């Protein structure tokens, strides 16, 4: 419950604190906890941005809204905007923060070139944002050998990985091109069964992350309406983990590790055409468990970037003590590589 003094003056975008020196803030906030401060700030953010978007929709008559900028990494804010009565559809650029300027600048330059040619570029959606570096099997195996890793090649990777997850093993999954933007979307991910409500505590500790950092689910598109309230048949905004949805009772019961305290979750909705390998793992797990969802969290240690190279993946795997590392079709178990753990 937020403290009353944190409901800011609605005539101002920010509270009138005079300045932001820590000692003055402490006096202003009094005995308010960090959680109360965060809740108050979140509420005010939602109020201000919702008013701005509603005003823009009213003035322009345009009901399909595109959001970009670092503030829209706030997925609960995005849900509030999506639920505005006059917003027909919502899209959040996957690399919504400053990193998105690279693609935005390139598209802007391209549009200028095309205008000179008499061609107008029209908006269109793109597929998955696997725009980063990739490494061949030969490069991966070279790094495994150089690091003296014990490994094997698996012949039916989706089935074998799904079985490991079904047996409550944590899998660090590395394949193909790295994701563009802040979200791990299956090519640099740690995946795990969503059934343990305490996973948020112990898995975050294993990764040296803050205990309040929640995990997100990845769900196959065929089953999304059973799990998320108000979701459409093909939600582009949910492809990149950029918005929360209220969860059904079924989702809360079957995948409690992915559901926030307020009953929402930040899903990645996956089609097979988007990432066949990743989709097949989730689908094979669904066949074993009856649950079409896995935990998907970024493959990195706390305050480190998502792993990019095979060398990064090997180091993070050994540092974390995660049960298994899969790189393309190569499988490494932590028990087989304890001689390398520092």
What residue ranges belong to the model's regions?
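Flexible beta->alpha loop and helix N-cap segments adjacent to enzyme active/binding sites
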Residues: 1-32, 54, 62-64, 73, ...
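Helix-hairpin-helix/helix-loop-helix acidic hairpins
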Residues: 26-38, 42-47
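Phosphate/ATP-binding catalytic cores across multiple sugar-kinase/actin-like superfamilies
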Residues: 40-65
């Amino acid at each position: 419950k937020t403290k009353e003094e944190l409901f800011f003056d609605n005539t101002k975008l920010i509270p009138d604190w005079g300045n932001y020196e820590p000692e003055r803030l402490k006096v202003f906030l009094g005995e308010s906890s960090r959680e109360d401060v965060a809740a108050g700030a979140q509420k005010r953010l939602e109020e201000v941005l919702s008013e701005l978007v509603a005003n823009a929709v009213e003035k322009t008559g345009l009901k399909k809204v595109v959001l970009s900028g670092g503030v829209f990494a706030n997925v609960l804010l995005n849900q509030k905007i999506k639920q505005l009565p006059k917003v027909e559809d919502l899209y959040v650029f996957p690399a919504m923060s400053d990193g998105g300027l690279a693609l935005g600048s390139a598209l802007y330059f391209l549009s200028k070139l095309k205008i000179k040619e008499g061609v107008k570029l029209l908006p269109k959606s793109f597929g998955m944002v696997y725009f980063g570096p990739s490494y061949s099997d030969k490069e991966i195996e070279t790094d495994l050998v150089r690091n003296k890793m014990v490994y094997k090649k698996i012949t039916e990777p989706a089935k074998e990985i799904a079985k490991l997850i079904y047996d409550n093993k944590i899998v660090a999954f590395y394949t193909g091109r790295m994701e563009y933007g802040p979200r791990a979307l299956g090519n640099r991910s740690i995946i795990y069964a969503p059934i343990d409500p305490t996973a948020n505590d112990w898995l975050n500790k294993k990764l040296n992350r803050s205990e309040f950092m929640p995990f997100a689910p990845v769900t196959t598109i065929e089953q999304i309406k059973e799990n998320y309230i108000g979701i459409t048949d093909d939600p582009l905004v949910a492809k990149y983990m950029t918005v929360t949805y209220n969860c059904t009772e079924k989702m809360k019961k079957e995948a409690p590790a992915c559901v926030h305290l307020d009953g929402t979750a930040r899903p990645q909705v996956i089609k097979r055409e988007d990432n066949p390998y990743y989709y097949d793992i989730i689908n094979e797990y669904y066949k074993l468990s009856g649950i079409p969802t896995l935990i998907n969290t970024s493959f990195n240690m706390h305050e480190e970037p998502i792993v990019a190279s095979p060398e990064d993946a090997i180091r993070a795997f050994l540092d974390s003590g995660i049960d298994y590392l899969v790189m393309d079709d190569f499988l490494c178990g932590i028990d087989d590589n304890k001689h390398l753990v520092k």
